[in-house]
């Protein structure tokens, strides 16, 4: 059986919020505050609106997004959150200000990118030619286009046969649809997928729902010290080749 290995992006391929170290060194505020400040500045650039009202509208837009992500299993592009804030103040026609803000929010982690998880480059070299390799990742602020740029800047993009990002396919983990889409793009049966990620529900239960394997990666953050559903737990990417050997993958 032809196999494919897919990786989560955040806290699996890269260390989430490791960019905060660089931001701090440059005297920049943490990303949540930087985003809120940018929203306030953008709205106040086109209308006389109080800062507290803008921040409240931004918080409401974020709450709506997290409901869509966690309950509806979809992650609309950040432009929807921006549009919601502007609409709160009757500023739907301020399209230039919205577009500029969207670009800023969507590229914040591209300008100051996260660092790679240990051993990522080496394992991708090891997997090349042995299995099909993909990414299955939810997108929160940085869309799929931005995550591709981060991968290119780390010289990793060429290792992947398919990249499935939730804002582009209209569904997010643990939806069955995102794993079925990955299998389709990688040219393998769903039960030939082996997915690696740091979250039990998303990265173990999700792939298992389509007959695929889900492995926990705890090399950056161990979210499940007691394990999750008997899934293998890997503390380093260099364990993947031996795990494939154990499955009889040539």
What are these regions (language model features)?
Residues 99, 103-113, 131-132, 162-166, ...:
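Conserved acidic, metal-coordinating active-site core of Asp-based
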